[in-house]
């Protein structure tokens, strides 16, 4: 419309107003002024300078809401006129989607639609359900199955077997699994630490961890673990009853913790992370920035993490050795791996500080697209570790105390292999995140419970098969298959107990 046309229309409206009653004239002029103010708000909302160009009263006016509706940019206006609310920036634009149907009214002569305040006093954003990360869920469930398989084959390894039957292939499995799976659990656990601290605060976060980690550890140490190790005791002292064995375990010792040592170590790292968060909430931002860059350059992140883990792990292995454990009652952990686990945990926490799905672990990132490169990256250090095992057994004659040079070289390849296979597994599951349904999806809610209760099941199955004339492979597969089914079924039943889902 030209300025001349606008002036003619205004004169016509003024002439019409002369023939109206004073009340009609006032109403007409209010509508005209409202239309002008609405158009002003349209322009302000379009260039996203709304909060600075309009006063609080103007921002809350129905006509400004009309301007926002007409411009296609709908913002939630709070009672004090602030436009923060549910507006969120996505690629430089503020967007929000209303979750209510509203009654529309049309301004006479203005051609603008606005939201009636009598119909809806405030536009609310639809709550967005937190979507689970299928790739990480499947990775965690897969790792749980790796733990079960690891424990199912240990008695049937060629070196150090406890069953009459053995198979050297299981030594190859155990060498690989023992080198990475617990470190990877700490990495995955760390991913969600910072979001939990931000959402709940350190106090409530730690209370939640006491429920999720401390309570299962206490119950497991007093019940699950003694039941599991009683199967081993019967082979050596069949005359000892379970009550006597249990009492001796918890009073005199030794009191092994089995695989649940992971729970108390993880809780300890959660406590440290909470203290770090209180002191400096941005302490892990450098790791997060590195993760965001790793969306396109994952090699940089992997190399930095490898360098840090190697520096922290190798000295501990040289000083303590590979088989030295800290033990205090049911609290136990390998001395030489404490810093390795802490490193994985805090790197995971750094990745999860912000944009978890937009950095290193992005489903469309470079890590997810480079699966094949991980095969040689994993095989090279693994073969070198086997070469060192040969040197230890055939040349050094398997000494109790290995020379420092040996531990240092082995520690280097151990850190390399652990890093490579962890990110290789992550790359695989990220690549096939959308590849339909998987049995891992069905197992995912019960994976933690399976981890907690599988140990007595697998040890008692091995006890009952000890005297059977079956090949080692058959025994291991039977033990693994039944352990998966029985621990899964038991977890499903236990989770039906009121309140159990908060723990299992």
Region annotations inferred by a language model:
Residues 5, 10-13, 19, 23-24, ...:
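Low-complexity, intrinsically disordered or signal/transmembrane-proximal segments
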